[in-house]
Amino acid sequence: MLRALGWLVLAVNKVAMRGLFRLRVEGLESLTAGGPLLVAPNHASYLDALAVAAALPWRSLRHTWWAGWTGIMFAGGGRRLLSRATQVFPVDPDRDPAGGLALALAALTRRYVLVWFPEGRRSPDGEIRPFMPGVGTLIQRSGAKAVPTLIRGSFEALPRDRRFPRFSRITVTFGTPHTAAELEGMGAGGSASARIANGLRLAVLALGDNA
């Protein structure tokens, strides 16, 4: 019953995002890589998770888990039910960062797809903020490949200071998957986790340069 509710929610979301926001999806071939995958989008709007969910093919959604901030996704019984139905697990970077990382690592160890927003919070101005080193730790410990993912248009549609969205186009671009070693070689920082996180951010930014 719970899983059926999740599929219904995801189906309605796909129709809404494609109809209202004219969702465009690029780079789906990046999701065919073997092994566990960590999908790492930039985060500028509440619409971001909805856009990624609508962009992912059904074959991927079956095995996809999501990191959801407890202050939003687990605030109240209805939201908790919705989160369980759509395979969202709680993350609280302020009170229990280790707990969220442990749940994420468990999902990747089981070779699932994991959607993780490395900035931690929505950007106040639409610019891509520094990525937190936790994502580097996840990639390093799990052996998962990271898929840099760029969301364009969500900030213009629903920035932090706006209550109701503008129905403008949103584009989701999935980039080439990278290993921890590749990302560490691309990035800068005082630790391996920081270098991996920075390399991943640069890979997301590069998707905008190539648009």
Tell where the protein language model's regions lie, with residue ranges.
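Helix-to-loop junction immediately C-terminal to a conserved catalytic motif
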Residues: 6, 13-43
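Structural motif corresponding to alpha-helix initiation and N-cap regions
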Residues: 25, 75-76, 98-101
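Non-catalytic C-terminal accessory region of glycerolipid acyltransferases
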Residues: 4-8, 98-211
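A generic structural signal for well-ordered alpha-helical segments
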Residues: 16-18, 59, 82-83, 107, ...
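Alpha-helical membrane-targeting segments
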Residues: 1-20, 74-86, 158, 162-169
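Short, flexible loop segments at the rims of nucleotide/cofactor-binding pockets, characterized by
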Residues: 14-20, 90-94, 125-126
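Residues at the C-termini of beta-strands that transition into short coil/loop
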Residues: 29, 70, 92-95, 150, ...
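Catalytic core of membrane glycerolipid acyltransferases/transacylases, capturing the structured
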Residues: 33-94
